[in-house]
Amino acid sequence: MPRHETDCRYFANGYCSKGNTCTFTHDVATRNENICHFNLVGKCSYGRACRFLHTRPRNDELPSCSTPQTSQNQQNLQNSGQRVRPKQLPELKFNAQAAEFVPRWKMPQRGPVTSYAGAAASADHGESSSSFQSSHEQAQLMMCPYHQKSGDCNRQDMDCPFAHGNYCDMCQQWSLHPYNAELRKKHENECVANHTTEMERAFLLQKTEQKTCGICMENIFEKNLRFGILNGCQHCFCLDCIRQWRSKDQENVELATKTVRSCPECRQHSDYVIPSLFWVESGQEKDLLIEMYKENTKRKICKYYSNERSRGACPFGNKCFYKHQLPDGSIDPGEAPSSRRRPRLVDFLFDDNSDSDEETFRRFQEEHEEEQEELLRFVAETLPEADEESELFRQITEVLRHYQISGHRRGFQ
């Protein structure tokens, strides 16, 4: 293999990994006997496996220093014939006799230490006011954050530029300003307000833990459910059960809306259900909950206005709690909600808007005169015992009212 005229620097240093296949010149005359420098000081970790020579060089083959020396120094070293030994460095060990480390801020003060506030005060008011502040300046001092939490400050009282407050029994912190009565009174009022809020929350939680749903009979708090509070009564239900109960008028046509909109226990009508994490029974707490519920729903867009197909078809009209926002950002005022009415029996018997003549009505009255007399006799016997909430009472009342109106209109009353 052709070789370059350049000498192999790896072979010259003692070892070439390519051996005879190296393309550079391996000249023995240029090879330097690499002596292990670690062995010279007696600390070679490889031992016999080291690839460098573990021999001591002759006087004329001493290793050169890393820094270049002048020719005069080399000549003096060769002429002296002295053997140069490497300098032995001291071994690193833990000193058990060393002094204990003390942070600077814990060291005893050798002289007066002037804080930033003290330096500013001395610059403004002179040397006489550096150690004393007026009552107005003391009242404007900020509270020390370290002393406020634990009552302990790393600095001494005379060196800390902040005010060290007094202990507050309500919040159990050193938060009472020692010089400013206004700030001290303000903090006391805040603590009293927070304490009152925590007490009210504890009372609500105590009442909440004992409530069970009137439909599924489960403990609502233990099941991690929400309460469905009716605005018209004080009975307790979980939100899922009462919503399922109130949606039956859309699933089963046999149940009237008035029935499912009433409480399952007391039949008291309620217009809406309020979801809540705590049980609120009555009084100002319930009024506040209703106001918060309405304010919260005002920020949400009504589902009938979020869909393009049903936009503007909200059955609640301007009575809806949600926001009727149009795509352009404007608010639709809406109209009053229209009342929904189920089909009645009288609607199929008579039609007030029909254009039937008097002859048709007279013939119908003659044909059904006997049925009318029997119906009136039946009503006279049954009406005192009929329940005003029953469906029969409602239908009979509608028929009689229609007979009376039709007869008065045509002169047959």
From Swiss-Prot:
Where does each C3H1-type zinc finger lie? 2-29, 30-57, 138-167, 296-327
Coiled-coil annotated residue ranges, if any: none
* Residue stretches of biased makeup (Low complexity): 66-82
Q: What class of enzyme is it?
A: transferase
- Say where the protein is mainly found: cytoplasm
Q: Where are the transmembrane segments?
A: none
Q: From which residue to which do the RING-type zinc fingers run? A: 213-267
Tissue distribution is:
Expressed in seam, tail tip, and other hypodermal cells, head and tail neurons, the pharynx, intestine and the developing hermaphrodite somatic gonad. Not expressed in body wall muscle cells.
Which pathway does the database say it acts in?
Protein modification; protein ubiquitination
**Catalysed reactions, as listed in the record:** S-ubiquitinyl-[E2 ubiquitin-conjugating enzyme]-L-cysteine + [acceptor protein]-L-lysine = [E2 ubiquitin-conjugating enzyme]-L-cysteine + N(6)-ubiquitinyl-[acceptor protein]-L-lysine
One of this protein's Pfam families, by short name?
zf-CCCH
Alphabetic keyword roster: Cytoplasm, Differentiation, Metal-binding, Repeat, RNA-binding, Sexual differentiation, Transferase, Ubl conjugation pathway, Zinc, Zinc-finger
> Which EC number(s) are documented for this chain?
2.3.2.27
Example GO BP: ubiquitin-dependent protein catabolic process
Tell me the segments the record calls region Disordered.
61-85
Instruction: Summarize subunit and interaction data from the UniProt record for this chain.
Output: Component of a complex at least containing lep-2, lin-28 and the long non-coding RNA lep-5, which mediates the degradation of lin-28.
State the protein's purpose: E3 ubiquitin ligase which catalyzes the covalent attachment of ubiquitin moieties onto substrate proteins. Promotes the larval to adult transition by binding to the long non-coding RNA lep-5 to target the heterochronic protein lin-28 for degradation by the proteasome. This association and degradation of lin-28 also controls the timing of the sexual differentiation of individual neurons in males including the AIM, AWA, ADF, ASJ and CEM neurons. Plays a role in governing the developmental timing of male tail tip morphogenesis.
- By what name is this protein known? E3 ubiquitin-protein ligase makorin
Organism of derivation: Caenorhabditis elegans
